């Protein structure tokens, strides 16, 4: 079955996501803010959910059409091939978003789409009411500038939830963003990666998973595993490929923190992620870490706002780590923070700055390549 698939991501990660979709062997059709559309098949549903490191969800796209009125929304939805995917006993709830469009009431759009899907299903199955007791097919709509896109969610739980982080401290960085930051820092087998304010250890864990080629979704469940048109064999084959892809690596990462509770949590998460051979977790003050003659890269998400008492405390910390990290040169430094004036307090203008998002929170990745 030929499919159009949509992988969503945090704003700023579209390029990385597109590259890994192509690395899986699938053709990229289009890229807009927060989503990449690509062509695939049922196998692609399994492989993309299991392997994509930067995606938040993977959807099957049923179609797009102009919808400036409820009538257009109803007719456009009804014309799509819903019965090719959803059985007469299955559950099909509707949710979505409407942005910059004439149809701005989400509850009204939900009701119209639900009614249209029922009408399409009735035409195929010859019944007027549906028990909705079977497999769940979550329908998602996205209306932007009066263009409606209708999709079915194949992921279920968001893909950033790998399964290794059961608990977190404060406002943790999302796993997909941590993976992207780790990749941007260009980790290498012979260069130590150090997160000296590791919190729950996510950046170091994602870096180790990247270097070990551990597929992020290989040990979790997805909504589409219950879809009758895909089948268990495809999922079993995709998981087998995921485990076969893993390699040994001498890559080494340090995950340290001044907070003992954070260290305990990071140790637990490292074990659950299966990267304890690559990630060493210990108690340390970021303002006192030593290079000890090694080549290294600092990649960190320093506490700010919710993760620290006050903004002034955070700014004082930025000054102190700025002075200390520069003494570690020629180490490169990558800092992700939502503080809008980080460079001023850190004491040095970054060589490169990338705007990213941790969920809906705008952040900046400050990259320091040289002294």
Q: What residues fall within each predicted segment?
A:
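Conserved S-adenosyl-L-methionine
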Residues: 173-290, 306-307, 311-313
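C-terminal catalytic and target-recognition region of SAM-dependent MTase-like enzymes
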Residues: 285-288, 292-371
